[in-house]
Amino acid sequence: MAKVNLEQIEHAVRLILEAIGDDPNREGVLDTPKRVAKMYAEVFSGMHEDPKEHLHKVFGEDHEELVLVKDIPFYSMCEHHLVPFYGVAHVAYIPQGGKVTGLSKLARTVDTIARRPQLQERITSTVANSIMEVLEPHGVMVVVEAEHMCMTMRGVKKPGAKTVTTAVRGVLENDAAARSEILSFIKTK
């Protein structure tokens, strides 16, 4: 996949400034196109990474009980409005066959998936599917909580409203007690 085209973004931002009635040569916004291009390269850096790559680092550990990394902060950009949404992801899995990954690898996977024009639902399911595919655990549960600026700044204008999405895979799909246990761990501060 091609890298971010900074010049093209700069040109587009100048056009947006003109389209809203601003002067792109005005002192306060003169460097805005360059700043926005640089920001987009960072914010959308996940476009050029395979999130599964982070999960391939495994440790041969005979642990087949729950592993939960909770409150992983993330930010993303709504693909519908190109405004931010941000929150936390909680990633739980039950390892199988000695395939335990580093805890930071779960956080890196979330970041890589989130750093692209995205939907919260897709982040949630892609994290779960990536873990299932690479680590082949007994089960996975991903819970994502986020506030969407497209609901805060425009439209319905409801600051503070949180959206919660879940993805459950493997043995956890049919184990309500295990899902409840994971949710209770997530709620515990």
Curated annotation (Swiss-Prot):
**Top EC category:** hydrolase
Q: What is its EC number?
A: 3.5.4.16
The biological processes this protein is annotated with in GO are:
one-carbon metabolic process; tetrahydrobiopterin biosynthetic process; tetrahydrofolate biosynthetic process
Listed binding positions for Zn(2+) are 78, 81, 150
Which pathway does it operate in?
Cofactor biosynthesis; 7,8-dihydroneopterin triphosphate biosynthesis; 7,8-dihydroneopterin triphosphate from GTP: step 1/1
Gene Ontology terms, MF aspect? GTP binding; GTP cyclohydrolase I activity; zinc ion binding
Looking up Gene3D superfamilies in the UniProt record yields: 1.10.286.10, 3.30.1130.10
Task: Give the GO cellular component terms, alphabetically.
Answer: cytoplasm
Has keyword Transport? no
Q: Name one Pfam family in it.
A: GTP_cyclohydroI
The protein's annotated catalytic reaction(s) are: GTP + H2O = 7,8-dihydroneopterin 3'-triphosphate + formate + H(+)
What keywords would UniProt list here? GTP-binding, Hydrolase, Metal-binding, Nucleotide-binding, One-carbon metabolism, Zinc
Q: PANTHER family from the xrefs?
A: GTP CYCLOHYDROLASE 1 (PTHR11109:SF7), GTP CYCLOHYDROLASE I (PTHR11109)
Family note: Belongs to the GTP cyclohydrolase I family.
Self-association and partners: Toroid-shaped homodecamer, composed of two pentamers of five dimers.
Name it: GTP cyclohydrolase 1
Phylogenetic lineage = Bacteria, Bacillati, Bacillota, Bacilli, Bacillales
